[in-house]
Amino acid sequence: MTAPQEPVDPIQDAGVEAPDLQAEIDALRAELAAAQAQAQAHQEQALRAMAEAENVRRRAQEDVSKARKFGIESFAESLVPVKDSLEAALAQPEQTAQALREGVEVTLKQLNGAFERNMLKDIAPAQGDKFDPHLHQAISSVPAPQPANTVVQLLQKGYVIADRTLRPALVVVSAGQG
């Protein structure tokens, strides 16, 4: 029978002193703890950044929603006096044609003022103006002495708001010499 062997310590067997290894293990544990703390801090920072981005996105959506909801408020406010004038005209008993016409002219001036304050402008091309597909809609083309693609007749005014066409002017254009 062989005698039981004493347990062999691999550290001592490798010729390394235990206190040196323990110091290295302690240093590595400290580095690991520092790295874990840094990773945790970075993760919390990333979560805060994601939450802030979500808050910014939500606020932007709310701003867009409010702009859509209340963007027309100024225009609507400028139309209220026009409506008041029309109602007052209808409330007047037995008006003469001349008085009615004058009232309509005043009301039209109010409406034009409201349009102007809200950057809504007429598109009313004159006869001979060059056809612009961004501002005009050709309803028909007729032989005419004017060069091709020029306005011969305005059928209905169009409108632009700021620089955007709200409704194109309806026009008849020249097909050129017939």
Curated annotation (Swiss-Prot):
Belongs to the GrpE family. HAMAP family: GrpE (MF_01151). It comes from Bordetella avium (strain 197N). It is found in: Cytoplasm. GO terms for biological process: protein folding. This is Protein GrpE. Participates actively in the response to hyperosmotic and heat shock by preventing the aggregation of stress-denatured proteins, in association with DnaK and GrpE. It is the nucleotide exchange factor for DnaK and may function as a thermosensor. Unfolded proteins bind initially to DnaJ; upon interaction with the DnaJ-bound protein, DnaK hydrolyzes its bound ATP, resulting in the formation of a stable complex. GrpE releases ADP from DnaK; ATP binding to DnaK triggers the release of the substrate protein, thus completing the reaction cycle. Gene3D superfamilies: 3.90.20.20, Head domain of nucleotide exchange factor GrpE. Disulfide bonds: none annotated. Homodimer. Coiled coil: none annotated. PANTHER family: GRPE PROTEIN (PTHR21237), GRPE PROTEIN HOMOLOG, MITOCHONDRIAL (PTHR21237:SF23). Keywords: Chaperone, Cytoplasm, Stress response. GO terms for cellular component: cytosol. It comes from the Bacteria. The gene is grpE. GO terms for molecular function: adenyl-nucleotide exchange factor activity; protein homodimerization activity; protein-folding chaperone binding; unfolded protein binding.
